[in-house]
């Protein structure tokens, strides 16, 4: 039996640039990504400094496209004591990929990141949290591709993503004829449903008191929690891309408040990497990380 003296809180960052978000995918082709001014290095550096202020260590799910163009960023994240994990290569949702295509991205991104950071990469997060009932096959692919945990399941019901029947707390779940550790994104009960909190737009757009209350809900009940943010979400000065009113509001609203909310949430507990928390919860073997091999 595990006796905890504090809740298992983790913090994660999906390292992608502002022009790579799913909401813009129908308007900005991947072939044009290189024509946009990149802001991911400076924004990630700001998050690293913010984490240092809070004495927090985090898991950085780095997009392969970003790693190829900014290899020094991956090395710097690792050198500051944070976990490097995979966010795929092209930011295509798993629902858009065949099993073979997904396997190729999973392997390519893992090897790329391991080569850059000099440590094993064992964690994965799908773009737009796109592991759902129809894409559970991806978990078996991840296990076969050398990963030990996933953090893609959002146990909510949304149009583009969500797996309402998925786990609401970290667990080992089926991955073909084996299993894999899963650290789901955070939600709180709201009647018969689950309400998303503390991740991406939900951290930024919901009233601050809701985010703080959600974190306190987890803390008081000692429910494991992973907070998630993107580097572009702390950048109110990023270029404005002209799309639909809803897409623009969802992307650009309240970018000037994300860092303040993060600071307040991070004061509620000691935040560490997803890998560390899964090991503490005995969902991964309690062994030290080794160099890539």
Where do the PLM segments sit?
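Active-site beta->alpha N-cap acidic-glycine motif
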Residues: 2-83
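Active-site-adjacent pocket scaffolds in enzyme catalytic domains
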Residues: 2-3, 119-122, 126-228
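Generic enzyme active-site microenvironment
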Residues: 12-15, 85, 125, 228
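Short acidic/His/Gly/Ser-rich catalytic and metal-binding motifs that mark active-site loops
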Residues: 18-23, 191-193, 236-241
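The substrate-binding groove and active-site-proximal loops of carbohydrate-active enzymes
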Residues: 30-38, 61-63, 90-102, 127-130, ...
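Generic structural signal for well-ordered alpha-helices
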Residues: 44-48, 71-75, 103-110, 139, ...
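C-terminal domain-boundary segment and adjacent tail
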Residues: 54, 205-293
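Metal-dependent polysaccharide deacetylase catalytic core of the NodB/CE4 family, i.e.
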Residues: 54-135, 147, 152-159, 178, ...
């Amino acid at each position: 039996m595990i006796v905890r003296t504090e809740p298992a809180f983790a913090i994660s960052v999906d390292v992608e640039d502002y022009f790579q978000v799913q909401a813009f995918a129908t308007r900005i082709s991947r072939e044009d990504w290189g024509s946009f001014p990149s802001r991911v290095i400076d924004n990630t550096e700001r998050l690293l400094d913010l984490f240092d202020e809070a004495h927090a260590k985090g898991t950085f799910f780095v997009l392969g496209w970003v790693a190829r163009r900014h290899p020094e960023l991956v090395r710097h994240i690792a050198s500051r004591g944070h976990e490097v994990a995979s966010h795929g290569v092209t930011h295509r949702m798993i629902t858009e990929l065949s099993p073979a295509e997904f396997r190729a991205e999973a392997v390519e991104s893992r090897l790329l990141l391991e080569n850059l950071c000099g440590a094993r990469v064992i964690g994965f997060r799908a773009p737009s949290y796109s592991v759902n009932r129809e894409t559970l096959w991806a978990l078996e692919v991840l296990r076969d591709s050398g990963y030990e945990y996933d953090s893609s399941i959002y146990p909510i019901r949304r149009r583009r993503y969500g797996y309402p029947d998925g786990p609401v707390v970290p667990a080992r779940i089926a991955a073909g004829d084996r299993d894999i550790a899963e650290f789901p994104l955070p939600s709180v009960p709201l009647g018969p449903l689950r309400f998303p909190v503390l991740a991406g737009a939900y951290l930024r757009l919901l009233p601050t008191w809701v985010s703080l209350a959600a974190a306190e809900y987890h803390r008081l009940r000692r429910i494991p929690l992973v907070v998630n943010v993107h580097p572009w979400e702390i950048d109110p000065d990023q270029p404005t891309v002209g799309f639909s009113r809803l897409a623009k509001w969802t992307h650009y609203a309240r970018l000037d408040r994300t860092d303040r909310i993060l600071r307040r949430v991070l004061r509620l507990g000691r935040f560490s990497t997803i890998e560390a928390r899964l090991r503490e919860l005995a969902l991964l073997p309690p062994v030290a990380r080794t160099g890539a091999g």
